[in-house]
Amino acid sequence: MAPKGSERTVKKVVAENRKARFNYEIVDTYEAGLVLTGTEVKSLREGKANIAESYATDEGGEIWLINSYLPEYLQANRFNHETRRRRKLLLSRREVNRLQGAVNREGMSLIPLRIYFNERGRAKLELALGKGKKLHDKRETSKERDWNRQKNRLLKERG
């Protein structure tokens, strides 16, 4: 048996929102469970989900994931799910209150970053609390990224 300090968390990433870190300044991240049907889980295990255009919102004291795309599971005939239905996110009451306060008072957004399966095989969503970037901030980010690439190339050539 391995010592406790050396345990690694194995996460099988199913879908990732790659533009989120470019369009938003991420302040904090949360791990939320997803309420899914059986065919949605099987579709996720095939790895064909898309959360690039999705967002999360709070309604009635609950957090919902809206506009996420989980394709239909081909082997399920009439018991299939809707591809773009609203999905409830499972968070503790304290986390829900904290997120609602940040969204309502500070004008922040709830951005889904990625869907993955944790080490127990449960589907989880990494949810971020962030502020939208302005155009000049996006330009600054891309300039910084380009400079880091050039710097790494130069260091690689010399050493």
UniProtKB/Swiss-Prot annotation:
GO terms under cellular component: cytosol
Database matches in SUPFAM superfamilies: Small protein B (SmpB)
GO BP terms: trans-translation
Protein name in the entry: SsrA-binding protein
Keyword RNA-binding: yes
Compartments, as annotated in UniProt: Cytoplasm
Biased composition annotated in UniProt, kind: Basic and acidic residues: 137-159
A molecular function GO annotation: RNA binding
Major localisation: cytoplasm
Annotated function: Required for rescue of stalled ribosomes mediated by trans-translation. Binds to transfer-messenger RNA (tmRNA), required for stable association of tmRNA with ribosomes. tmRNA and SmpB together mimic tRNA shape, replacing the anticodon stem-loop with SmpB. tmRNA is encoded by the ssrA gene; the 2 termini fold to resemble tRNA(Ala) and it encodes a 'tag peptide', a short internal open reading frame. During trans-translation Ala-aminoacylated tmRNA acts like a tRNA, entering the A-site of stalled ribosomes, displacing the stalled mRNA.
Family membership noted in the UniProt record: Belongs to the SmpB family.
Stretch list, region Disordered: 133-159
Gene: smpB
NCBIfam families: PRK05422.1, smpB
Keywords on record: Cytoplasm, RNA-binding
